[in-house]
Amino acid sequence: MSAGTIASHVGNASLLLLLAGCLLLTSCSSSGSDGLRAYPKAVGAADEASAIQNLRTIANAQTQAKAMRNSYADFNALVQLGFLDERFAGVNPNLRGYRFTVVANENEYAVNADPETTQTNPTTGGRHFYLDSTDGVVHVSPTQTATRQDPAL
């Protein structure tokens, strides 16, 4: 086999691989634009799931703070006590596009997670979440800051 024939076969194989890759990419996009529209929804669901998990993490940290010092705590105190990591430091930390706020005193706490887009933490989630010390149930509102009166998740 001559060098020209080998180069021709390699070129044809590369072209076939390129075509196969294009076909695979097209089929993976699930009917073109439908697949592309599904991606932001999946990311939004992941952001919301992360916010809900963070609320539960905060609830666990609050339980530990109450047991240790007989009082609930704000985010900075929970971080200083080692119950939350540094991502939660500050008055209203923003994690994965959700702004967390906490109101805490000796006897109770309430925490909200509201979508907030920042340059470093864009969000695709749209629902608002609430959890407090009374029952540990996550409540959800589709349009505004959630409260205890909103439906449970």
What is each of the regions a protein language model found here?
Residues 2-17:
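Bacterial N-terminal signal peptides that target proteins for export
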Residues 20:
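Small, basic N-terminal interaction modules of short regulatory proteins
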Residues 24-27:
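C-terminal motif of bacterial Sec signal peptides marking the signal peptidase cleavage site
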Residues 29-31:
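Bacterial signal peptide processing site
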Residues 37-41, 60-125, 133-135, 142, ...:
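Extracellular/periplasmic head regions of type IV pilus-like filament subunits
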Residues 44-55:
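Membrane-proximal amphipathic alpha-helices
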